[in-house]
Amino acid sequence: KMTFTPHGKHLIAGEWVATERTFSSDPAHGPSHAFSVGTPALVDQAVRAAEDAFWSFGHARREDRAAFLNAIADEIEARADAITQIGTQETGLPEGRLQGERGRTVGQLRLFASHILAGDYLDSRHDPALPDRSPLPRPDMKMVQRPIGPVAVFGASNFPLAFSTAGGDTAA
């Protein structure tokens, strides 16, 4: 079994970025690993990269977006042992717990891909105005689901995959 060591950098726009300031942690076993401290400048850099990706990804064909999510799921499965090992080192969670979460994450990615292909996200509704409704008139109401751009996800460390890295909130 190979041993994987976290390198403690931030992944921003496909590049691994580090800062001079670090902190150390290994809640599972020790010895500690050094992790680069995030800065406001790195957050700004990540937000700009996410906005750039949003415009290209948001205008991609449905089939391409679904294929992208399925490819992420495939890569997570292909790197299952490494992801579990690093997740254990970073969080102290047991392997079985991370394996279950990894399966949930892959399932979420594939679920969102299937919703994209089916067009489920295109749901729109229109409730026409009822000016004579009593006791008050109802205005014309429309609901359209559309992407609005990147969101910040402050993920819980007790769900390092399913919520914070690749799962529900991120994939949605």
Placement of each model-derived feature along the sequence:
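Conserved small-residue-rich beta-alpha loop and adjacent elements
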Residues: P128-A172
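N-terminal Rossmann-like NAD(P)+-binding subdomain of aldehyde/semialdehyde dehydrogenases
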Residues: K1-P139
